[in-house]
């Protein structure tokens, strides 16, 4: 069945936004610091901010502007009518860049704490090597139960993130039918939305995760099918042409540093 911007056909009530984009934030200073720490074999990631306050890097700012330019270049009737963002600084900066590129005020961006990064608890700021050295029992537990179900002390599992995103999906279906919605979040947020919208199981989404990271400012796009009863994947991991040759942040969903 083809996709459509119409909210309903043949008297059937639509249940979804007409268009949905789920985007990872631009490269952050935490991404850079984590990659340096991992490559140097360090135990801890050197960050001056708490995770929620980590800003975009200079490259991340450029990526956010490029994403905004791409969105602003869409025909007006195809641009987002609603922008939702994680409360984390790097995501809000990315969302604001898009809003400004489209000539919208900063107030056009609505922040929602349910879109925040997965919380890593006691493992926050530790590198992979640091976790193995400092928390060997947790490292073994993660291997045993798998990343989908593993919850570090004080942190979240993928299931916990999915649980909070289910309520956002419900909001989209109740309050934003026929709208064009842009969501700016984090890598695990993108993957968990895919799990929900495409009705995946654990094995399927983890196989996708193993294929590689979601690019910074990478776009996963859905369109409502003709009757509005479901969403169809249009593309995933798409980056605006200006960003096509940029490096992708390495390490998939490691419990360390800012994602």
Where are these regions (language model features)?
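Glycine-rich phosphate-binding loop signature in dinucleotide/nucleotide-binding domains
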Residues: 74-79, 172-179
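Phosphate-handling substructures
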Residues: 29-55, 101-166, 223, 234-237, ...
